A protein has these predicted regions:
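Conserved N-terminal catalytic core of the sugar/cofactor nucleotidyltransferase
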Residues: 2-5, 13-16, 27, 31-118, ...
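Active-site glycine-centered loops adjacent to acidic/histidine catalytic or metal-binding residues
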Residues: 9, 109, 136
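A structural signal for short hydrophobic beta-strand segments in well-ordered beta-sheet cores
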Residues: 25, 149-151, 215
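Short, conserved catalytic or adaptor-binding loops enriched in Gly and charged residues
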Residues: 67-73, 150-152, 206-208
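Short loop/edge segments at beta-strand edges and connector loops
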Residues: 80, 107, 134-135, 161
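Conserved donor-nucleotide/metal-binding helix-loop-beta segment in metal-dependent transferases, i.e.
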Residues: 114-143
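Catalytic-core segments of class I nucleotidyltransferases/pyrophosphorylases
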Residues: 121-124, 156-246
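Anionic-ligand binding region
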Residues: 133, 139-170
Length: 247
């Protein structure tokens, strides 16, 4: 299975910090944010990676990561997203790298307390389809700003809503997604959303509608360090005290 780390975007929610660098190069405790995403995948056994970035600081990822061997990566490639076209568009740039394999996609501003190895193992045991990782969240106001799954009586995902006014569950979709090879057939069929981007939620709902979406529920802390300045410092404080990607 290949791994894709998405490290693009404008980082506008972290201005003014991101006026001088890519948000994924900002520090989380004692090292750059993107290195936690790399550690997340490598510690879960995924060691062939592609980093997708964009903007004016793309070269800094090469300076930081090089060939990736220092971080336990067996093979590291890079792709450049020329404009902010959405997560699904960024994933589409990796098709030749993935080359018919399965893929795990990780947003580089997502930080996890616990290892994702159980989710990787569960996805590899799936015959086909997709898999997401959910986190429990009790704050309705926060739920309204995230992707929220609707679950039926059997606990199966029946729809994923983006930023719902009335959240249908107390779970959120974190920034890690697992797909079979069909994902690269789905992406070209997507229509841009109102903000002009190809949305990963539309990809996920394609699998949901065909009853081919499974999920795991996280144990431990999960934070989106790119969500806001407050969230960025919350993740920093947690990692400083508790660490990340623990087995």
């Amino acid at each position: 299975m290949k791994g894709v780390i998405l490290a693009g975007g404008t980082g506008s929610r972290l201005h003014p910090l991101t006026r001088i660098t890519n948000k994924h190069l900002l520090p989380i405790y004692d090292r750059p944010m993107v290195t936690y995403a790399i550690e997340t995948l490598v510690s879960a056994g995924v060691t062939e990676l592609m980093v997708v970035t964009g903007g004016t600081h793309a070269g800094e990822f090469l300076r930081l990561l090089g060939n990736g061997h220092e971080y336990g990566i067996d093979r590291l490639l890079y792709a450049y997203q020329e404009r902010p076209g959405g997560i699904a568009e960024a994933l589409g740039l990796t098709e030749r790298f993935v080359d018919g394999d399965r893929v795990v996609v990780l947003l580089a501003d997502n930080v996890f307390e616990r290892s994702l190895r159980p989710a990787v193992t569960n996805f590899l045991a799936q015959e086909s389809g997709a898999r997401i990782v959910l986190a429990r969240m009790e704050d309705p106001a926060h739920l309204r700003h995230l992707g929220v799954p609707e679950l039926d009586d059997q606990g199966r995902v029946v729809h994923i809503l983006e930023k719902p006014d009335d959240p249908p569950s107390n779970h959120v979709v974190t920034g890690v997604y697992f797909y079979d090879e069909r994902v690269f057939e789905i992406i070209p069929t997507l229509r841009p959303s109102g903000r002009g981007e190809l949305e990963i939620t539309d990809v996920n709902n394609w699998y949901v509608e065909r009853r081919q979406m499974e999920y795991d529920v996280l144990d431990g802390f999960w934070g989106d360090a790119g969500e806001s300045i407050d969230a960025y410092y919350e993740v920093n404080d947690f990692v400083r005290v508790h660490g990340a990607n623990k087995g």
